[in-house]
Amino acid sequence: YRFFEIWFTQPIDHAHPERGTFRQYATLIHRDPTAPMVLLHTGYGNWYYDYPGEVTRLYHANQLVIEHRFFRTSRPAAIADWASLTIEQAAADHHVIATVMHRLYAGAFLETGASKGGMTSIYHRRFWPDDVDVTLAYVAPISFAAPDYRYEPYLEGIGPADCKARLRAIQVEMLTNRRAALQTLAGAEATQEGRSYTRIDLPAAVESAVISLEWAFWQYVGADGCAGIPAVTATDDELFAFLQVVSEVGSSADANLAEF
């Protein structure tokens, strides 16, 4: 395939184009103008670049990865406020882009993304239903409020009881008896990997990772991983290794937070 980097000039406010513009970044994998076109969203920056996503591979399709407005390079030189960072404005961005791509590609248009990318694909379809033929949204967690109280009873209802008990037991162990050891191990890992923790300090990052452990386990691992939960008597290194696999402390590192 051929690979292109593309910048689309977009209004900051589609209802008031006189308020200025920004350049929205996208990357194109071009195979064939008659093949399907996949519009791929992350909901954040463009970290796919030239990597073909699952839907693209399945359909041997063209692919356009669209960076979300106001993330990474796709932002105005100066942002007076964030009022135009809305799902409707983003959907309008994607409508502009889809309209352009329809002039170039004759095949079916598919739209996809995971997590906030899945949500983004749904929002585009909600405002501009005729832009794509198919929407394949992976993991689109549309919350109703902050906080959304539906999550807690849902978590209570999934997974074997003994598995949940062991998972919660090591959370308690980590925060009551292993906190200092985990912070030491996380600090060593940060030094080795060149990570900094200035927006959220390291002790808070460790605590956040432990608190998020149950959520992350059921989101990314599932019941098949129950046998791999270490005992409360496991070594500090074993507990830290498990934490890093399931709910990484580095999620709160400066470089990672900058992406979101």
Region roles according to the model:
Residues 113-123:
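Glycine-rich nucleophile elbow surrounding the catalytic serine of serine-hydrolase chemistry
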Residues 56-76:
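Conserved alpha/beta-hydrolase
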Residues 130-219:
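A catalytic-pocket lid/entrance helix-loop region that shapes and gates access to the active site
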Residues 105-115:
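Alpha/beta-hydrolase fold nucleophile elbow
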Residues 83-104:
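Alpha/beta-hydrolase active-site loop
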Residues 1-62:
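Catalytic-loop region of hydrolases
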